[in-house]
């Protein structure tokens, strides 16, 4: 056996006290020990639950002894992510929507909720804005191509 196993939100194995979770942890630990030369396990998740996960079993902390903490994205980076969703969907932001989004992202980054989702937050915001845009345009009889491809400020205001 060899390769790389990536487990996102690994702490779900240790929550709830299920036998399945403990069995999965035991199996992973055994595979790591038996295949040290050619098997890598990477676990990922939010910092606090990951710390609890690593402390849930004496073998975990010693086997996962390298930690990399990825900082949250800045408002500018989040804007770039949102814009990439726009480009991928042939959409654009109106000028006032750009400024609104910049202000919203600055506020969001200063008041982050626990377990802030970064890129996923931008995907969700984009999808809600698209839904809002579709609802707004459904009330218009004659819709231009530009209107179909533009997210306006009101689409964003109701998206978060």
Language-model features: locations:
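Short, well-ordered alpha-helical packing segments
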Residues: 25-29, 51, 83, 123-126, ...
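Conserved catalytic/switch belt of AAA+ P-loop NTPases
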Residues: 2, 7, 11-42, 48-61
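C-terminal helical "lid" subdomain and adjoining coupling/linker elements of P-loop NTPases
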Residues: 93, 108-160
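Conserved C-terminal "switch" segment of AAA+ ATPases
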Residues: 49-55, 70-115, 134-141
